């Protein structure tokens, strides 16, 4: 499964959004399957939830990690999604093949060439 989208992700310091950074540890043989599960969850469930802004899935070159960098309008919107039965099904599928370490973050510094 490969999807190509233009991202709505904008990283700005001191904005009011909630940023989820979720690092999954996975066996290399399961890395692409996990990526596919996360993309499917995003397309079918997460993107339909109130407050969802964007999700960006990254996979490590050594095959042992997958990172989901997602943005939500608020922490409350993110917490509400966690209680959605459809979201729980997708999260459990991912957790059946990987260990997750996720937290919500606030951007405090950004530096780029386009100043």
What are these regions (language model features)?
Residues 2, 41-53, 71-106:
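An amphipathic, aromatic/His-enriched active-site/gating alpha helix that lines ligand/cofactor pockets
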Residues 17-25, 54-84:
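Short, well-ordered beta-strand segments in beta-rich or mixed alpha/beta enzyme
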Residues 25-38:
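Short, surface-exposed ligand-recognition loops at beta-strand->loop->(often short) alpha-helix junctions
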């Amino acid at each position: 499964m490969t999807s190509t989208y233009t991202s709505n992700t904008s990283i700005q310091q001191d904005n009011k959004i909630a940023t989820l950074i979720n690092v999954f540890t996975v066996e290399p043989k399961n890395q692409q399957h996990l990526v596919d599960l996360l993309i499917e969850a995003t397309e079918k469930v997460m993107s339909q939830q109130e407050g969802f802004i964007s999700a960006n899935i990254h996979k490590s070159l050594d095959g042992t990690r997958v990172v989901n960098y997602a943005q939500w309008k608020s922490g409350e919107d993110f917490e509400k999604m966690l209680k959605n039965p459809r979201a729980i099904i997708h999260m459990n599928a991912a957790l059946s093949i990987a260990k997750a370490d996720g937290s919500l973050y606030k951007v405090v510094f950004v530096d780029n060439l386009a100043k």
